[in-house]
């Protein structure tokens, strides 16, 4: 792994070039397997772990927060052993779609942050994302709410995910004009089979405001690994394969073939 770190503006937060996503923790990965993945990631030089309060509410028997709880247990366990200290691991989580904390009203953002901190067993998170937009809220209210968490010491840096480029620009403009904590990173869907929006809208926006860019679904839900080439491949992995089905097109398979040629 490239051990070089990327600074999130002037926030003091630095993240690895490859962030570990925690959306499977408590879903397809139990505590023991999740701990093994986290240990291996840190041992390889990684320092940033991404989760969300909603992970993994969609799984039968879950209610949301399972990933945060596992991550919190891992941090606590490593603090009791020779593992990495809290300051060595950048923790990112998100707000907006947890069943009990839907939306980005100031009251909800504050309450959801406190709930996430409790599950994680922390007094602050390094990076707090608006997970999805809330059209019922003006951007000004959301920007104020996130900045207030930074002022309170509960959040070190603000991130935006799944907002339109226009709403992100409005947020960044408002934060700059009102001396608030500015969004330091944007996280959007981006991979070799879905490039247009990220390259055409979000990358120029990030450059304009000095935001770091981070992609999710970088492997297109596993499609870019080449393991999904037929409908039968999708059916054989029902837990994860269904999300990759939309890429199973002649265009998508052409990308797989081109990738195989250069891999």
Model regions and ranges:
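N-terminal binding-site loop/beta-alpha segment at the start of enzyme catalytic domains
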Residues: 1-89
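Conserved, mostly hydrophobic/aromatic
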Residues: 8, 20, 34, 49, ...
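Beta/alpha (TIM)-barrel catalytic core signal, keyed to glycine-rich beta->alpha loops juxtaposed to Asp/Glu
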Residues: 133-263
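Short, acidic/polar
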Residues: 30-41, 104-120, 168-173
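A short acidic, helix-capping loop that chelates divalent metal ions and anchors anionic groups
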Residues: 55-60, 98-102, 224
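Short, well-ordered coil/turn segments that N-cap beta-strands
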Residues: 13-18, 45-47, 83-89, 122-126, ...
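Active-site mouth loops of central-metabolism enzymes
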Residues: 21-32, 95-107, 136-137
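Active-site groove signature of glycoside hydrolases
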Residues: 117-136
């Amino acid at each position: 792994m490239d051990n070089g770190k990327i600074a999130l503006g002037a926030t003091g937060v630095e993240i690895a070039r490859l962030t570990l996503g925690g959306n499977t923790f408590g879903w397809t990965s139990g505590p023991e397997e999740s701990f093994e993945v986290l240990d291996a990631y840190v041992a390889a030089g990684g320092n940033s772990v991404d989760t969300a309060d909603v992970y993994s509410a969609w799984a039968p028997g879950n209610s949301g927060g399972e990933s945060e709880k596992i991550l919190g247990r891992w941090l606590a366990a490593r603090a009791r052993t020779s593992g990495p200290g809290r300051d060595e691991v950048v923790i990112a989580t998100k707000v907006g779609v947890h069943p009990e904390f839907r939306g980005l009203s100031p009251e909800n953002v504050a309450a959801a942050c406190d709930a996430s901190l409790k599950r994680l067993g922390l007094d602050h998170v390094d990076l707090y994302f608006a997970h999805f937009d809330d059209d019922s809220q003006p951007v000004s209210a959301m920007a104020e709410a996130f900045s207030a968490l930074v002022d309170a010491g509960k959040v070190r840096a603000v991130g935006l995910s799944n907002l339109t480029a226009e709403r992100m620009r409005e947020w960044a403009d408002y934060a700059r004009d009102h001396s608030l904590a500015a969004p330091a990173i944007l996280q959007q869907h981006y991979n070799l089979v879905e490039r247009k929006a990220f390259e055409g809208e979000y990358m120029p926006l990030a450059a304009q405001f000095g935001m770091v860019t981070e992609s999710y679904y970088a492997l297109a839900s596993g499609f870019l690994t080449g393991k999904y080439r037929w409908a039968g491949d999708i059916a054989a992995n029902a837990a994860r394969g269904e999300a990759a089905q939309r890429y199973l097109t002649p265009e998508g398979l052409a990308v797989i073939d081109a990738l195989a040629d250069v891999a």
